[in-house]
Design a protein with these regions (language model features):
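Hydrophobic alpha-helical transmembrane segments of integral membrane proteins
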Residues: 1, 9-13, 62-65
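C-terminal membrane-associated helical module and adjoining short loops/tails
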Residues: 1-5, 14-15, 25, 34-41, ...
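Multi-pass alpha-helical membrane architecture of UbiA-family
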Residues: 4-7, 79
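Core segments of transmembrane alpha-helices
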Residues: 10-17, 68-77, 103-104, 126-138
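Active-site His/Glu-centered metal-binding helix of metallohydrolases
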Residues: 13, 42-50, 67, 71, ...
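Membrane-embedded alpha-helical segments that form the functional core of polytopic membrane enzymes
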Residues: 14-60, 76-96, 155-172
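C-terminal ends of transmembrane helices
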Residues: 48-53, 105-113, 176-182
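Helix-adjacent hinge/juxtasegments
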Residues: 60-116
């Protein structure tokens, strides 16, 4: 296994550690979650750069990298649902999960035909927006823990929710683009069923 793929696997390993830090209340657990999420996000930045610079792009990497991204960001959004149950994030998470399952299904259908669908620019932008909104929300949660409840904490959390909904919009748009670009995998399969 080459270095970029090892970084991707490392991101997968860091995901449950991040989720544990997010959900398990211990002193500065949001800081620990923020550090773990930041480190995992950096592996996403570096695995692709190293793979392209050194000519180490593989089909495994093209398939595993977006899957590792989905796992990391989904864990964060599910964690936020648990930590902020009244924040209306359930719908955001449902839209994100629907898009992720849909795109993963398209990738699996394509893989059956020997085609590996790499992440598109819209998909990469979606991932960046999701990661930024998650990082902001982790910082806002930690700030809220330090300064206590009040107008400032509420404002920080509302701004975080707005960022999450911006990421949701990008998620839905990129999902529609993926399905449209890969619609032949649906029509071909539908013809096979008839």
């Amino acid at each position: 296994m080459n270095l970029p793929n090892k970084l991707t696997v490392l991101r997968c390993i860091m995901t449950p550690l991040f989720l544990l830090a997010l959900l398990w209340a211990f002193p500065y657990h949001y800081v620990a979650a923020l550090v773990l999420f930041s480190a995992a996000s950096l592996t996403d930045l570096f695995d692709g750069k190293i793979a392209r610079a050194r000519g180490l792009v593989t089909n495994l990497g093209k398939f595993l990298d977006p899957l590792a991204d989905k796992t990391l960001t989904t864990a964060a959004f599910l964690g936020f649902m648990v930590k902020l149950p009244g924040a209306g994030l359930c719908w955001a998470v449902m839209l994100i999960l629907t898009r992720e399952f849909m795109v993963t299904s398209v990738r699996l259908l394509a893989a059956k035909d020997g085609v590996v669908i790499a992440a598109s620019m819209a998909g990469k932008a979606k991932t960046v927006l999701q990661m930024v909104s998650i990082l902001y929300m982790l910082a806002a949660l930690q700030a809220g823990e330090l300064i206590g409840e009040g107008a400032l904490t509420s404002g920080l959390l509302i701004a975080g929710q707005v960022l999450i909904w911006i990421a949701v919009a990008a998620t839905v748009i990129s999902g529609i683009q993926y399905v449209w670009a890969c619609r032949r995998y649906f029509t071909d399969r539908a013809d096979d069923v008839r």
